[in-house]
Amino acid sequence: MSVHIEAKQGEIAETILLPGDPLRAKYIAETFLEDVVLFNQVRGMLGFTGTYKGEKVSVMGTGMGIPSISIYVNELIQSYDVKNLIRVGTMGGIQADVKVRDVVIAQAASTDSQINRNTFAGVDFAPVADFSLLKKAYDAGVEKGLSLKVGNVFSADRFYNDQLDKQQLADYGVLGIEMEAAALYTLAQKYGRRALAILTVSDHIFTGEETSAEERQTTFNDMIVVALEAAIK
């Protein structure tokens, strides 16, 4: 048991999927896993463990933003010795060829958060994905005939930020904007764990095209299958 997770030792798998929305965690568990057990509901942050193709896998919500995911990733690693952490979430696209509902694998994560600046005394640490997980996810997506995008994403510290120069990010090749990957990658590298963010484009920041809240909560199955296949390969 940790401060924010009530699971007993052994109830959380070495590999965990991390959606921001706890209701998406519930959807993933009920739709894709077998022999599901609820291990956490502290603060409504639902966590489940089950099996996928015979392999033990967990899934748990993290909430929104770098501070929230940092709490749960720290506790999952330090209190439960989780080895592989795969974020499955949404992002806003900013490239012309990144379409709504596309699946994006975040190779690296830039950020305007000051967390890493504080940690590294002003040094610009570059948070990157684990290559082995990235390759497994990419291969799984290609095998299923998906059109995947792989590249840099931007982990924003604020959801509403009129001052952020999104066009400049696009000009430098950033695929889209989300809010958690930079923290996930940094903590995984700190503790010697493997991490990856697989994201579905829920809206396009420049065109205004978007998906519904219900669709974000209960679909985006391509992303989830890619994550699960990467988790067990």
UniProtKB/Swiss-Prot annotation:
<feature type="binding site" description="in other chain">
    <location>
        <position position="20"/>
    </location>
    <ligand>
        <name>phosphate</name>
    </ligand>
</feature>
<dbReference type="GO" id="GO:0005829">
    <property type="term" value="C:cytosol"/>
</dbReference>
<comment type="similarity">
    <text>Belongs to the PNP/UDP phosphorylase family.</text>
</comment>
<feature type="site" description="Important for catalytic activity">
    <location>
        <position position="216"/>
    </location>
</feature>
<dbReference type="GO" id="GO:0006152">
    <property type="term" value="P:purine nucleoside catabolic process"/>
</dbReference>
<keyword id="KW-0328">Glycosyltransferase</keyword>
<keyword id="KW-0808">Transferase</keyword>
<dbReference type="InterPro" id="IPR018016">
    <property type="entry name" value="Nucleoside_phosphorylase_CS"/>
</dbReference>
<comment type="function">
    <text>Catalyzes the reversible phosphorolytic breakdown of the N-glycosidic bond in the beta-(deoxy)ribonucleoside molecules, with the formation of the corresponding free purine bases and pentose-1-phosphate.</text>
</comment>
<dbReference type="Pfam" id="PF01048">
    <property type="entry name" value="PNP_UDP_1"/>
</dbReference>
<feature type="binding site" description="in other chain">
    <location>
        <begin position="202"/>
        <end position="203"/>
    </location>
    <ligand>
        <name>a purine D-ribonucleoside</name>
    </ligand>
</feature>
<protein>
    <recommendedName>
        <fullName>Purine nucleoside phosphorylase DeoD-type</fullName>
        <ecNumber>2.4.2.1</ecNumber>
    </recommendedName>
</protein>
<feature type="binding site" description="in other chain">
    <location>
        <begin position="87"/>
        <end position="90"/>
    </location>
    <ligand>
        <name>phosphate</name>
    </ligand>
</feature>
<feature type="binding site">
    <location>
        <position position="43"/>
    </location>
    <ligand>
        <name>phosphate</name>
    </ligand>
</feature>
<feature type="active site" description="Proton donor">
    <location>
        <position position="203"/>
    </location>
</feature>
<dbReference type="GO" id="GO:0004731">
    <property type="term" value="F:purine-nucleoside phosphorylase activity"/>
</dbReference>
<dbReference type="InterPro" id="IPR000845">
    <property type="entry name" value="Nucleoside_phosphorylase_d"/>
</dbReference>
<dbReference type="InterPro" id="IPR035994">
    <property type="entry name" value="Nucleoside_phosphorylase_sf"/>
</dbReference>
<feature type="binding site" description="in other chain">
    <location>
        <begin position="178"/>
        <end position="180"/>
    </location>
    <ligand>
        <name>a purine D-ribonucleoside</name>
    </ligand>
</feature>
<comment type="subunit">
    <text>Homohexamer; trimer of homodimers.</text>
</comment>
<dbReference type="InterPro" id="IPR004402">
    <property type="entry name" value="DeoD-type"/>
</dbReference>
<feature type="binding site" description="in other chain">
    <location>
        <position position="24"/>
    </location>
    <ligand>
        <name>phosphate</name>
    </ligand>
</feature>
<feature type="binding site">
    <location>
        <position position="4"/>
    </location>
    <ligand>
        <name>a purine D-ribonucleoside</name>
    </ligand>
</feature>
